Every structure is written in C-alpha cells, then in structure tokens.
C-alpha cells in the first residue's frame, strides 16, 4: 500500500494528460501543496519502487499501484422532496433548480464526468419523471425509489448497495464552486466546512490523524458535514452489512445514513475532508437569493406568480418562507409580504379524486360572509390553491375547555341555520363507498373484522336514512385543528375542503369522532349543540353520525396510508369509535322499535 504522501504525489501525476511535458519537482510541489524537500524524497521513493520513470512520469506499475484507490462510480441521491425548500420544491425537484445559470444536478454530473467518473447512478423518487431526461442527455443510470415519501435516505442506499465500492455519495442539490471530485481517493471521507458560532448541522469530532470519532447534531465553532462523502471499498463493505442488518428498524428508516454511520463510528473508518468554503446547500429560497441575485426578481415559479397576482406585489417582496407541517393532505407554507404574514395552501397530490375544489371555493366565500373564517383571501376554484391571512401564535380548540367548545358549537349552529345553499353535496355514505372503491386491491383494508364492521355500518346507514333531517350547509371536517384561536380569543373555522349540503350530524359526528370524549361527554356535547336535552330520536341520530363520521374518516385514513401518508393514532380512534358508537346508536334504534 502507498503512504498518504506517496499517494498524493503519484495520483497528482497520474491524472495529467499524457501529451503534456513532464513536471518538475517544483511544479509538483506547487500542485500538491507539499514542500520541495518532501517532494524530492517522495520522487526518489517512487522511482525506486518503479512507479515513476525517472522523468517524473508514471509507469504501468505506478498505475497498478493506484488501482485500489481509483474511484469506481458515484451515486447521486435525488429522491426526496426537500420540503424545506417551499414553494419551489412543490413545482419540481430541487435538483432541477437553476443556480448561476446551471441546473444543479446537471452541474454536478458534469463535474463528476470532468474528473473521469462516468459510472453515475441517480436515485429518483419525488417527481421522478422530471429527471428521466438525464439518462439520455448524460448517459447516467436511473434507479427509482418508491419509498422516498415514507423513509429517509437509507432507503436510497439500500437500493444501490450492490453498487457501493469506491463510491462518491452525492446529494443532488449541492452547488460546488470548484470541482471537488477526483479520479483517485486515498480513503473514505466526509466533506466539511467550519462554522463560526452555532450551527444545527451534524458536527464532527476527530483525532489527530483526522479520523472522525464522533458526530453530534448541532454545535458551535465546529467542523460540520456538508456536501459529498466518499466510501472506499472497505467502508462500503462494512456499511452495507450494517445497512442490511438494521434496515428494517424504524430508527434506521426514519434517520439519515449519517445516523447509522454515527451509531457504528468505531467500526466504520472515515476521515474528515476540510474545505475552506465553496460548498453550498440551499435550505431556503432566502439562502438561494443571497447566493444568486437572479432569484430576487425572477423565481420561475407559478406559485410566486399566483401570490403576486392576488397581493399585487413583486417576487422580491415575498420572503420569510416557512413550510407548515400540519395537515395530512395539502402542502402549505407561511410567507411575509408588505409587513404582513400569509399562508399559501398548495393542493396535495391525489386530492382531486375526492375534493370538489369549486364547491370548496363557494363554501369559503360563504364562511367569510358568515364571519366564520376571516382569514380567507382568495382561492383558485379550478386548481385549488389558496391564500389566507396567517394567525400569529394561533391555538387550536381544546376539547375540554367549555368556553371554547361552546363557541365552536355556536359557530357550527350558525352555519347550519344560515340558510346558505352550497354548490356541493356531502353524502357521507356515498363518500364512504367511494373510499371503499379506491381501497379495492390494496392491503390496508384487508384485515380481520373489516367485513363485520362494514356490515354494521350498512345496518346503521339503513336506520339513519329513515330519519327525516333537512340538509343544511356543513363544514364536514369540523375537528379541533380546524378551529383556530388568535391571541385576542377570536375563533376561526378554517379548511373548507369537504364542505357541502349535508346532514348536520356530519359536523357534530366529526367533532366528537376526533376527540377523546367519553360517551357521557359526547351526549353532553350533543345537548349543548342543540341547546336542549335531546329527544330519543335526536340522540340516536347524532350518536349514529358519530359512528358514521368515524367510519368515513377511518376509510379516509386507510386511503392516506395506501398513498404512503402516515395518519397515526387517529386511525385507531376512528376505528374504535365507529364500532362503539354504531353499537350505541343501533341499540337505541332497536329499543325504540321494540317499544313501539
């Protein structure tokens, strides 16, 4: 094996074009950054080993000695959505952003190829079809990661683990001012920059030789991971074994590959590669604007065009963009413009299958007129994007705060008795059957008890259908996160995607179905909504709609899971309430029929 200094000198000579004149020792010293005396000694060693020919040219034996250090390939990770880079990442993969006149991933590919690395694999996922052109244009290989939306980047490396050898691991959204790639690399490393002051990045601790001995998230005045990494064959072999062994663990799938490395840092030998600067990861549009002034006035974004048209502003006045993680179906972000804060709602993929956007637009206009949602500014009835005022430090309704619950119930009552005619109809049974149709052929609805649950709900539907309850304007998604309270205590009922003419039981049923109420508390809520003690017919009807709403949202949740969107604990709550309240309601229907 070569020493590090021998490798540095030999690899420097090896990558020079063969038709160029031989280098002097002084030129080698300048090119490698080593002292002239050191170079003189190294040249003598390499001459004696037969790796140089006496005229500072590499021999065949020298190339053979370098062969174990030659880079085999590169993997570019381009599967993720980069949600922090809203809103541009809503429209195309971040890899396709044009920075300083060049598409990020194209620049990276060209830099790899300029270094002599032609075996390049790109792992795609989010908006994958927009990246397929790279295969023909640059002769790269494409691998599709179908798990990009539910697992982190270990899922990408798992797909290409058989390709991990002497391999550069790259992110598709890095911008390197200078080409960092080399045809020969001595050992595994991670690129790093120095942070003066605090940083939230992965910070490294190293020993005297530069081996990484510790990694922690966040630090101060520290070298942190950024940009590319390099796996040598030894690292790749050990890392692949660990990845295969631990991949099924939720900790591994949810974390980054760097987290797996950090847990096994003693087994995995990797060194720090320090750079003075010139490596960029743009985590927000504001960061990109600071680097490329073209984005101040021209974002090449239809979302920005939408905002400018509604707020009568220019792109450079839109700033402070922060993704909002609440909500299971849509993508939203907060932004500032003209001294005020707003929210832009971008319709989630697939929502057009079950949401009537024109009906939502009419409902939002009605809600504003009724004083139920003063946040609303504009909605595009055809495409579903929406702009609203942002409520600073908003709180959501507390199901166990009597004053808040009474306010929410009064708002629902105001809507139900308003006489407003909405364009759409929310037939909950029709919606239930729609989700059942969509779930056909999926695994998520194939479980013990599902058929029995559906038969129970069919029986309940037959009873509810016999109740004579006039349809009225309903919100149909009236659970506590949609009741926002500002700092002055004013409540807003937001998100009218499901609104339509419906049985008022849809709203009360949903309100209770998403709570942790006992059945006694649920009955009290029904009475508070009605403003009087419910009759037997009223109580059974509203209890039945708690079950029906729970079943609807349970199926909705299964559909989200089938689309790889994690619903969480609500799924169990809805399943439990569907069974529990269906039994209660059916018992009351049976009792009254027996009495009659």
Spans of model-derived segments:
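N-terminal glycine-rich phosphate-binding loop and ensuing alpha1 helix
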Residues: 65-128
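Conserved alpha/beta core of the MobA/IspD/sugar-nucleotide pyrophosphorylase nucleotidyltransferase superfamily
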Residues: 63-74, 224-310
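Conserved beta-loop-beta/alpha segment of the NTase-like Rossmann-fold superfamily
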Residues: 129-202, 206
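Active-site activation/catalytic loop segments of kinase-like enzymes and analogous catalytic loops
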Residues: 505-534, 547-565, 584
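ATP/Mg2+ or Mg2+-diphosphate-binding catalytic cores
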Residues: 292, 296-300, 556-596
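ATP-binding pocket architecture of kinase catalytic cores
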Residues: 322-429, 436-452
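Conserved core of the sugar-phosphate nucleotidyltransferase
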Residues: 177-252
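An alpha-helical support segment within catalytic cores of ATP-dependent transferases
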Residues: 302-319, 420-476, 487-488
